[in-house]
Each structure stands twice: as structure tokens, then as C-alpha cells.
């Protein structure tokens, strides 16, 4: 323990005059006080002097049967008074820092490393003094750690929202247990359909090469084919395929007007053989046409069409894509039925031949959502991912489809509209058109 050479010149009040309320200077003891008698408990005791940093307690011992106080000059048994605090302690970060600084100063006081004002300072003392100064310089204002955590959480939540909006929904996750949905191959299947629709794309100007057939005649034929489709309760796949067969055949062969209905009947027959489980007989189709053709003529036209198309019957139609896109859109039965109505209406219009089947299906979904949803968005990331079309890319087709839907209310070709006015299909043909 280092000794303190120069005592501090601080005036203190004597212990006896103050009645023990104050402690004298521990480093300076008056000579007059050494050896003075003091009455303790009615007895006279010998008062011992108190050395620097010596024992501050009053020890008693028995001298001739009477208790007297003596002060032992011992540096080994230093006992510092412990402060008590009866208040409820609220622990804060700033209070913890202050308490730590106070503890450091107390420990330095006990160990005797507190320097005198004029005394030398060794390395250990200097390090302790610097530590205490650093403790005193720390701001006592508590740090609100919760504020920092809240800011970090807000940033993470914003990033999570952005990530969720940018990632399309997996629409096949709930069909993994169903082997008929072929979830493992569905992406490859529709990639193949997209390749097929480009390979089998129909010339949008083929009607110009027909000298006897115009757009109006084609529309009448397709509307009559829809009536036959409804009468025999055929599948929607059969209708779309039969119209595709007619367009592909007319794009390669010029025919007279008298053969146009025969081409339509034969196209329905071929589509039924390809799609239906039980196909109507040839005589049924002949009867439906009011005997406009014979059984032999249907057989002969069937041979010609298959030869011209090289027996190529597997094509991509709007219905293939429509079901997939409706699933991506999360459409209910009413919206899906309206989408089918718009797709089948597009088959009547020759101008819609310029669009590939996937585009017609995507535009049908878009227009149907416009007509049934009170507010947007009408196109989202999931639809963009599964349709492979942005909203800006389908607007032209959607505008054409909207005009087709508007003309259907006043057109004489009412087979498609009549079909979708039935309660079975939720009367979606009566839903008014929305301008956009």
C-alpha cells in the first residue's frame, strides 16, 4: 500500500465538540488530542490517536472490570460503512453506468490508490483515474434500445412485403396429391402448348384469298356450329377444335359458298371423334343441316380435310389456356363462366384470328375481371407469371374483345349469347360491359 506523504489542509470539526457527528481528518491528528482522557460510559479511558486510513471504529476492552474504548492502529482490518437505500431501485442503463463508476471509486479508496493532490501518481493509479474519468464522461441519459429495434423491425417488414408482392403464388401446391392434375409436368405441358400455337398460327388475312367467302359468311357458319354444339351437348373443347379445323382448312383451300356448311359439319364430326366419348352419327349431322348434304359427301369431305391438314388434330385452343389462367387469377365460377363466354364470342369474329389462343384467353380473363371486380388491380404478378403477358401487352386484344362483347347484345348471331343466358351458366351474358 502506498503512503500519502502530504496531508490535505482541510479544516475539520473535532469529534468531541460535535458529539461524534463528524469524523476528523484522517491524515492529521492534533498533538493535543493524543493521550487525552475521555469519559466513556462514566469511566475514564485512554484515548489513542488515529493514524492515516486507520481503523475508524470504536473498539472496547475491559480494564479493571470497566468497558473502555480504544482505537487500534491497524491497516489490515479496514471496514467501510455500507450505504443503504430503502427506496425501490429502478435499474436503468444510465444508473448502471453511474453505479459502476461509484463502485470503481470505492474500490480505489479501499485499496489506497486515491492520490493526494500533491503526491506522486504511479501507473496503476493513473489507469484507475482515467477509468473513473471515462465513467464520469459517459452521458447519463438512458438509451432507448426499443426504438432501434422498432426501426429494424419496420425495415424488415417493408422488405418482406416487397418480397411477397414480387413473388408469384404457386397455384399447383395444393394439387400435388392429385395425379390427374400432373403438377410435376404442368409447366412443360403449357410450354409445349405455347410452341404449338406458334407453329399452328393461322394466317390473319386468309379470307382475302377466298373469292366466294367473306367475314360475314364465316361468322354465320361459326354461329350455326355453336347451335349444333349446344343441341348435341358437346364439350367446349369440341367447339374450339372444330372452329380451328375450319380456319386452317380455309386458309389452304378455296371453296365455293355451297360447300361452306359441309366443311362446318365435317369439322364438327372430326372434333367429336377426337374429343368426345360418344360422338353423334353422321346422319344426325346431316339431319341437323336440313339435308343440305349427303352421307357420302360428309365422308368425302372428311377425307379431304384430313389430307389437307396431314391428320394434324392436336392443337392448342383458348380453352386450354383459359382454365390455367382462371386458376392463376383465383376466379370464382361466375367469373370463369364469363371468361368462357368471351372466349367463345371471339371465335365468331374473324378479326380475332390475328391473336394466338393464349392471348385470347388472357384477354378474356382481363375483361371478365374488369366486368366483375369493383376495383383493381385487374392484373397481378401471378397472372403475369403464368400467362407470360404483361397488362400492356394484352390491352389491344382486350379492347377488341370488349367491342365483340358489346356487339353481341344487338347482333343477329345469338347462339353463343343464348347459351350463356341460361341459369346453369349463371346468366353471365347479361353482365353489362365496362368501359376501360
Swiss-Prot record:
Pfam families: Cyclin_C, Cyclin_N. It comes from the Eukaryota. GO terms for biological process: cell division; G1/S transition of mitotic cell cycle; microtubule organizing center localization; mitotic cell cycle; response to calcium ion. Keywords: Cell cycle, Cell division, Cyclin, Mitosis. Residues 1-17 have a biased composition (Polar residues). SMART domains: CYCLIN, Cyclin_C. One of its GO terms (cellular component) is spindle pole centrosome. GO terms for molecular function: cyclin-dependent protein serine/threonine kinase regulator activity. The keyword Cell cycle applies. Residues 1-33 are annotated as: Disordered. Belongs to the cyclin family. Cyclin AB subfamily. Interacts with the cdk1 protein kinase to form a serine/threonine kinase holoenzyme complex also known as maturation promoting factor (MPF). The cyclin subunit imparts substrate specificity to the complex. Essential for the control of the cell cycle at the G2/M (mitosis) transition. This is G2/mitotic-specific cyclin-B. It comes from Dictyostelium discoideum.
Amino acid at each position: 500500500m502506498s503512503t500519502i506523504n502530504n496531508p490535505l489542509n482541510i479544516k475539520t470539526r473535532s469529534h468531541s465538540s460535535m458529539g461524534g457527528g463528524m469524523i476528523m481528518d484522517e491524515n492529521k491528528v492534533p498533538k493535543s488530542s493524543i493521550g487525552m482522557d475521555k469519559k466513556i460510559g462514566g469511566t475514564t479511558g485512554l484515548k489513542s490517536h488515529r493514524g492515516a486510513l486507520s481503523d475508524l471504529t470504536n473498539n472496547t476492552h475491559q480494564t479493571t472490570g470497566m468497558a473502555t474504548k480504544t482505537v487500534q492502529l491497524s491497516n489490515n482490518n479496514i471496514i467501510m460503512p455500507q450505504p443503504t437505500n430503502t427506496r425501490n431501485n429502478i435499474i436503468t442503463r444510465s444508473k448502471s453506468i453511474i453505479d459502476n463508476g461509484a463502485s470503481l471509486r470505492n474500490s480505489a479508496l479501499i485499496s489506497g490508490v486515491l492520490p493526494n493532490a500533491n503526491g506522486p501518481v504511479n501507473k496503476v493509479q493513473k489507469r484507475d483515474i482515467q477509468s473513473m474519468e471515462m465513467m464520469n464522461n459517459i452521458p447519463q441519459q438512458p438509451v432507448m434500445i426499443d426504438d432501434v429495434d422498432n426501426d429494424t423491425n419496420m425495415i424488415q417488414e417493408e422488405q418482406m412485403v416487397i418480397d411477397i408482392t414480387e413473388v408469384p403464388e404457386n397455384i399447383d401446391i395444393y394439387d400435388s396429391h392429385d395425379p390427374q392434375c400432373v403438377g410435376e409436368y404442368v409447366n412443360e405441358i403449357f410450354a409445349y402448348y405455347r410452341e404449338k400455337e406458334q407453329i399452328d398460327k393461322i394466317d390473319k388475312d386468309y379470307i382475302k384469298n377466298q373469292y366466294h367467302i367473306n367475314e360475314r359468311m364465316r361468322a354465320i357458319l361459326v354461329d350455326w356450329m355453336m347451335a349444333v354444339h349446344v343441341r348435341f351437348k358437346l364439350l367446349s373443347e369440341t367447339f374450339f377444335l372444330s372452329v380451328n379445323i375450319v380456319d386452317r382448312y380455309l386458309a389452304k383451300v378455296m371453296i365455293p359458298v355451297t360447300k361452306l356448311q359441309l366443311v362446318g359439319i365435317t369439322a364438327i364430326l372430326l372434333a367429336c371423334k377426337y374429343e368426345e366419348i360418344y360422338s353423334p352419327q353422321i346422319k344426325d349431322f346431316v339431319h341437323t343441316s336440313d339435308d343440305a348434304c349427303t352421307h357420302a359427301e360428309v365422308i368425302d369431305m372428311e377425307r379431304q380435310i384430313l389430307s389437307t391438314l396431314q391428320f394434324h388434330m392436336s392443337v392448342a385452343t383458348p380453352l386450354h389456356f383459359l382454365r390455367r389462367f382462371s386458376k392463376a387469377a383465383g376466379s370464382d365460377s361466375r367469373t370463369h363462366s364469363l371468361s368462357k363466354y368471351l372466349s367463345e364470342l371471339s371465335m365468331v369474329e374473324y378479326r380475332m384470328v390475328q391473336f394466338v389462343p393464349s392471348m385470347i384467353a388472357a384477354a378474356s380473363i382481363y375483361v371478365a375481371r374488369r366486368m366483375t371486380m369493383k376495383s383493381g388491380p385487374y392484373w397481378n404478378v401471378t397472372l403475369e407469371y403464368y400467362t407470360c403477358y404483361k397488362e400492356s401487352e394484352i390491352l389491344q386484344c382486350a379492347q377488341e374483345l370488349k367491342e365483340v362483347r358489346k356487339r353481341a347484345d344487338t347482333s343477329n348471331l345469338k347462339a353463343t349469347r343464348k347459351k350463356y343466358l341460361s341459369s346453369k351458366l349463371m346468366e353471365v351474358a347479361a353482365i353489362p360491359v365496362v368501359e376501360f
